[in-house]
């Protein structure tokens, strides 16, 4: 591997601003804010608006589009469905 071409990868705490859920992960993103993790160490804190704790796909609150296909929409629009 070449030296000095790879980004600095370090551990950070991601915090969901909607639920307060926090998890420790690796990232190249930097932050001026810091927080203490469960192991007693201090890590940079990155706040995110959506995480697996609040995203509808992961929470089971996702709604699927039940409008039908293009043909059904056309038939409904022009009253061709019988």
Swiss-Prot record:
Keyword Ribosomal protein among record annotations:
yes
UniProt GO MF annotations? structural constituent of ribosome
Enumerate the Pfam families for this protein.
Answer: Ribosomal_L31
Q: Supply the source organism for this entry.
A: Bacillus velezensis (strain DSM 23117 / BGSC 10A6 / LMG 26770 / FZB42)
Quaternary state and interactors = Part of the 50S ribosomal subunit.
What UniProt keywords apply to this chain's record, in alphabetical order? Ribonucleoprotein, Ribosomal protein
Top-level taxon of origin: Bacteria
SUPFAM superfamilies for the chain: L28p-like
Q: Name the family the entry cites.
A: Belongs to the bacterial ribosomal protein bL31 family. Type B subfamily.
Q: Which InterPro entries match?
A: Ribosomal_bL28/bL31-like_sf, Ribosomal_bL31, Ribosomal_bL31_B, Ribosomal_bL31_sf
Annotated Gene Ontology cellular components are:
ribonucleoprotein complex; ribosome
Coiled coil where?
none
Entry's Gene Ontology BP terms: translation
Task: Write the protein's name.
Answer: Large ribosomal subunit protein bL31B
């Amino acid at each position: 591997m070449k030296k000095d071409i790879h980004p600095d990868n370090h551990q950070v705490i991601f915090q969901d601003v909607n639920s307060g859920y926090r998890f420790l992960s690796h990232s190249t993103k930097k932050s001026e804010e810091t927080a203490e993790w469960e192991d007693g160490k201090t890590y940079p804190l990155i706040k995110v608006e959506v995480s697996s704790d609040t995203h509808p796909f992961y929470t089971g609150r996702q709604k699927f589009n039940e409008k039908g296909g293009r043909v059904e929409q056309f038939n409904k629009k022009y009253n061709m469905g019988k």
